[in-house]
């Protein structure tokens, strides 16, 4: 599990909640830090903020999807960007779930757990369901 957010408070909030649920959690401060760490950590799931310095979440998610070594890692965008265009862009990139801040830690845990188990995420969560790539 890799938690990527430039806001230390949010990064630690996510990391602590996931650690308490039994996840082995590493953190990164931005997209570049994520890419630098991802191969060594080999996470099943990455939570990723969008608005970050150096390398934003959009580009980070795109680069993860394009790289054969990281293309199957589940990506959950957790962001303050709640516009429909942002959610659509997430689907186009191929993120697995999209949660908006402020988020419910319980819902975030359910989504991450479902993705880590490679099961579909909770369909009752509007943002999560909207964040999935459309099936062809």
Functional labels for PLM-detected ranges:
Residues 12-20:
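Charged docking surfaces used in two-component/phosphorelay signaling
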Residues 22-29, 37:
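Short hydrophobic/Thr-rich beta-strand motif most characteristic of the beta2 strand and flanking loop
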Residues 41-47:
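Active-site beta3 strand of CheY-like receiver
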Residues 52:
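Receiver (REC) domain active-site loop signature in two-component systems and cognate sites
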Residues 103-113:
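C-terminal output helix
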């Amino acid at each position: 599990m890799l938690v990527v957010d430039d806001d230390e408070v949010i990064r630690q909030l996510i990391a602590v909640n996931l650690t308490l649920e039994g996840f082995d959690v590493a953190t990164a401060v931005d997209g570049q830090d994520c890419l630098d760490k991802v191969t060594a950590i080999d996470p099943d799931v990455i939570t990723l903020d969008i608005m970050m310095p150096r390398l934003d979440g959009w580009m980070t998610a795109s680069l993860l999807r394009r790289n054969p070594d990281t293309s199957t890692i589940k990506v959950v965008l957790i962001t303050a960007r709640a516009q429909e265009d942002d959610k659509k862009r997430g689907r186009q990139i191929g993120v697995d779930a999209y949660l908006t801040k402020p988020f419910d830690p319980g819902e975030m845990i359910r989504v991450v757990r479902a993705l880590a188990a490679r099961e579909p995420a909770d369909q009752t969560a509007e943002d999560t369901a909207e964040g999935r790539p459309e099936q062809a």
